[in-house]
Every structure is written in structure tokens, then in C-alpha cells.
A protein has these predicted regions:
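Serine-esterase "nucleophile elbow" of acetyl-processing enzymes
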Residues: 39-93, 111-112, 140-147
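Catalytic His-Asp segment of secreted/periplasmic serine-dependent ester chemistry enzymes
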Residues: 196-297
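A structural motif corresponding to the C-terminal end of an alpha-helix
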Residues: 78-85, 172-189, 224-245
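Charged, often glycine-rich, active-site loop that binds/positions anionic groups
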Residues: 94-111, 256-270
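Oxyanion-hole/transition-state-stabilizing segment in secreted/luminal serine hydrolases
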Residues: 55, 104-165, 197
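Secretory targeting and sorting signals
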Residues: 1-38
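Structural recognition of the beta-strand scaffold that forms the well-ordered cores
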Residues: 43-48, 52-53, 85-90, 119-124, ...
Length: 297
């Protein structure tokens, strides 16, 4: 359901960046007038990977083209809705290590955007760590094409190796990253989002042209995504971070659904330049979940 109109107490002032306001209005949000005696706006740091950056969604943030960051990503929608002062350092292909190390020359570690007086931090992270999840998507897509969509060639070849890598590497790295954020802003509200479903729960033969995953590998890839989200949830619980379950919300809005229903673009014949990533509607829904989970409405 759409975000409710912001109350004046929360909509303290319109974000000064015109792109953020324009993007939010395009997604159906309205900006409330500034109260006569507004208090200081929330100080909001947005961290994370391409799902937070909205890589592939227009318009692109011109300040850092390497990160493929959109000014219509969910952090901008949240900021425009709440009147928060946003520092957006989300970046496509980011891994947990990029919270404390420069991802690209000239791109500071993401945790540098978090300060002791930061009020709000949001992020998605973990999907790119060691290439585990993205490698699984690519591997399963390749195997699906080669098998003509039959069987479970990806599961047969890789078994539990992807899940094992999440347990051994991604999960502890997530805890380290979240602890680093919490240490820098101990009083901030910190929320990490789970990843939305890419595939439906069961194979849909009509979707193979858009998402060439073999019928037996659709539940396999879905199970892997469940495992990744469970790791994110556990890391959140162990670090005092709010976990926002976006997978549950995205049920029925996977990459196999038609335009206007899907929140994730398919591997082929999608409407975004970056496949298997949230579209503008998906980013809007992510913003709604953040607002509701953190009581920002």
C-alpha cells in the first residue's frame, strides 16, 4: 500500500536536493509544508549495495557514476517523505568490506558517512560478498540455457556450496559490518533490508524466456536466497539492528511477473539497464517497508 502522507511533525522540511523531491513525487509521495518552528531534520546515512543504490533506475546520480546510484532509490524516497538530511553513499557491487575500505579510487569507505550524531542508517548488503549470490544467479541461468530448462543442473553441480559460503564468509562479515555501523552511531536507528524474491516459489514455464532458470533450479535458487536473507536476519538480531523483511512483502512481485506488478527486473527483456535488480516500483515499496518498520510515518 502507498506510503501515507507525511505528518507535519515528521515532514520537517523539503529535502534541498531537487532530484530527491522530484523522484519522490514521481513515485506518488507528496511533500508537506514546513512547520513554522521546525526542529532539526533527521540525519540519515544510506549505505549498501546496488539494491539500495537502485542501479539501473533513472535518473542516475551524476556525482558518482561508478556507483550507478539512482536519485530515485529508496533512501531518496524515505528522505523526501520524512524531511531527513540524506547522505547517500550506496554503491553498486558493494560488499561488506567496502564499509571499511574504499570500493573504488576516490570512493570513501561507506562507514565514513556515519557519525555519532547520525539518527538513521539503512542498508542492503551481503549479496555481493565473495560473488556468492550473483555467481549463483549467473551459474543457474547459464545452466538453465544449456539444459533447455530441464532438470536441476545448477543444484546438481553446486549442491550446498553457495550456502556453505554464506555461512562461512557472508554471515560473519555481515556481523562485522553492522557492528562497525552501530559503533559509529550508537544512538541511531539502523535497519538492514532482506533481499526481495527474484524467482517465484515454483517454476513458471512461461517465464523461461525472461529468466532462464531450469525448472528444478527455481526452488534451488529460491532456497539459496532464503538462506542469504536468514543470514542477514541473524546478523541483525545479534547486533541490535532492525531487520526489514522485504522478501515477504515481495511475494508475487518477482521477476516473472508483468511490468507494473514485478518489483524485480528479469535477466532478459527487462525494462531496466541492470537486470535482476529492483525497478522504480520496487524501490518505492522498499521505502514503504523502511518507513513502517522504523515508525517514520
Amino acid at each position: 500500500m502507498p506510503l501515507p502522507a507525511p505528518r507535519p511533525a515528521l515532514r520537517r522540511r523539503v529535502l534541498t536536493a531537487a532530484s530527491a523531491v522530484t523522484g519522490a513525487l514521481a513515485l506518488g509521495l507528496t511533500a508537506a509544508p514546513t512547520p513554522a518552528h521546525a526542529t532539526a531534520p533527521l540525519k540519515y546515512a544510506a549505505l549498501g549495495d546496488s539494491y539500495s543504490a537502485a542501479s539501473g533506475v533513472l535518473p542516475v546520480d551524476p556525482t558518482n557514476l561508478l556507483c550507478l546510484r539512482s536519485t530515485a532509490n529508496y533512501p531518496h524516497v524515505v528522505a523526501a517523505h520524512t524531511g531527513a538530511r540524506l547522505t547517500d553513499v550506496t554503491c553498486g557491487a558493494a560488499q561488506t568490506k567496502d564499509f571499511t575500505h574504499a570500493q573504488y579510487p576516490g570512493v570513501a569507505p561507506q562507514a565514513d558517512a556515519v557519525a555519532p550524531d547520525t539518527d538513521l542508517v539503512t542498508l542492503t548488503i551481503g549479496g555481493n560478498d565473495n560473488g556468492t549470490f550473483i555467481n549463483a544467479v549467473v551459474a543457474c541461468g547459464t545452466a538453465g540455457v544449456l539444459s533447455g530448462g530441464a532438470g536441476s543442473p545448477c543444484k546438481d553441480k553446486y549442491g550446498t556450496s553457495f550456502e556453505d559460503a554464506i555461512d562461512a564468509n557472508t554471515y560473519p562479515a555481515l556481523k562485522t559490518a553492522l557492528r562497525a555501523v552501530r559503533a559509529k552511531a550508537p544512538d541511531a536507528r539502523v535497519a538492514v533490508l532482506g533481499y526481495p524474491w527474484i524467482t517465484p516459489a515454483t517454476a513458471d514455464p512461461s517465464c523461461f524466456a525472461k529468466l532462464p532458470i531450469a525448472s528444478g533450479d527455481v526452488p534451488y535458487l529460491r532456497s539459496l536466497q532464503t538462506h542469504l536473507n536468514a543470514a542477514v536476519r541473524r546478523a541483525a538480531e545479534e547486533t541490535g539492528t532492525t531487520y526489514v523483511d522485504f522478501a515477504e512483502a515481495s511475494e508475487g512481485h518477482d521477476a516473472c511477473e508483468p511490468v507494473g506488478t514485478r518489483w524485480i527486473e528479469p535477466l532478459l527483456f527487462g525494462s531496466n539497464i541492470v537486470p535482476v535488480h529492483p525497478n522504480a516500483l520496487g524501490e518505492q515499496r522498499m521505502a514503504e517497508r523502511v518507513v513502517n518498520a522504523l515508525g517514520l510515518d
